[in-house]
A protein has these predicted regions:
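Short, well-ordered alpha-helix to beta-strand connector turns
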Residues: 26, 122-123, 201
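Active-site phosphate-binding/coordination module
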Residues: 1-93
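Conserved acidic, metal-coordinating active-site core of Asp-based
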Residues: 62, 66-69, 73-188, 192, ...
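Short, well-ordered beta-strand core segments
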Residues: 29, 204-206
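Residue-level detector of anion-binding/catalytic polar loops
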Residues: 4, 69, 149, 203-204
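Glycine-rich beta-strand-to-loop/alpha-helix junction loops that act as flexible
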Residues: 33-34, 188-190, 203
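Conserved residues at beta->alpha junctions
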Residues: 7-10, 50, 129, 154, ...
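Basic, amphipathic juxtamembrane/active-site segments
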Residues: 1-2, 206-208
Length: 208
C-alpha cells in the first residue's frame, strides 16, 4: 500500500532486536538517533550526520570530569571498556539494559584511544550515571558547547550526537528521499530521544 515501516532507534542496526531486524517489509532504518539513515536491505548508508573525530574525543575526555560510564559508536560498532562493563550496577543500569550492552559492545582497553586511532567520525556517544546531580552537570556542560545534540532514552543516561542527528531530522530526510511529504509521515515514541520525531512528523503519537 506504499506505507514504509521504519524503525527509528538510538542503537546501531546490529543492536536492534532480531525479531525487528528480520521483520518482513523492513527496508529502511534510522539508527543512532538519526546519525545514520540506511537501506538495511541493500546495506547502504543513505545519509549520515556524525560527530567529527575531534569533537568525539573532546566529549569523551569531558566524561572523565564526571563519575560516568561512557561508550562510543564508530563505523557501525559500539565500543566500551572493561572497567565500565564489569561495574554497570554502579551506574544504575537496569539488568535488561546491561544484558543488551554486553551483547552489543566490543571491549577495548581505552575508548578514547580507539576513537583517536580510527580517526573516523563517531555516530553517537553514551554517558551513564549513578548520580542525577552529576548527570545534570554534564548535560549543562554539553549543551553549553552549542555544537552537539543531547538527548536521553533512560533516566540515567545522556546520548550525544552531532548537528542534524536527531530522529526527527532523520525521518524528514528519509521521507524527502522517498518523495514523501512531511504531512504524510507518522511517528510513535515513548522516550526523550523520540521527542524530535514526534514533533517533526505529520502525525506524532506519544506512547506511555
Amino acid at each position: 500500500r506504499g506505507i514504509y515501516v521504519v524503525p527509528c532507534t538510538g542503537r546501531i542496526w546490529s543492536g536492534v532486536p532480531e525479531f525487528l531486524r528480520t521483520l518482513p517489509g523492513i527496508q529502511y532504518a534510522i539508527t543512532t538517533n538519526g546519525a545514520i539513515v540506511e537501506d538495511v536491505e541493500k546495506h547502504k548508508i543513505l545519509d549520515e550526520r556524525k560527530l567529527s573525530c575531534a569533537q568525539a574525543i573532546e566529549i569523551l575526555e569531558l566524561a572523565e570530569k564526571f563519575r560516568t560510564m561512557y561508550d562510543a559508536y564508530v563505523d557501525g560498532y559500539a565500543y566500551g571498556e572493561r572497567r565500565f562493563l564489569e561495574h554497570m550496577d554502579e551506574y544504575a543500569i537496569p539488568d535488561t539494559i546491561q544484558n543488551m550492552i554486553h551483547q552489543t559492545r566490543r571491549e577495548v582497553p581505552d575508548v578514547i584511544q580507539k576513537v583517536r586511532d580510527t580517526g573516523l567520525p563517531v555516530e553517537k556517544i553514551n554517558y551513564f550515571f549513578g548520580d542525577q546531580q552529576e548527570r545534570a552537570r554534564a548535560r549543562r556542560e554539553l549543551q553549553e558547547r552549542g555544537d552537539v545534540i543531547v538527548s536521553s532514552s533512560l533516566d540515567n543516561n545522556l546520548e550525544i550526537n552531532g548537528p542534524g542527528a536527531s530522529k526527527g531530522e532523520g525521518l524528514l530526510r528519509l521521507a524527502s528521499m522517498l518523495g514523501i511529504r512531511r504531512e504524510e509521515t507518522m511517528a510513535f515514541g515513548d522516550g526523550n530521544n523520540d521527542a524530535s520525531m514526534i514533533r517533526d512528523a505529520g502525525i506524532g503519537v506519544v506512547m506511555e
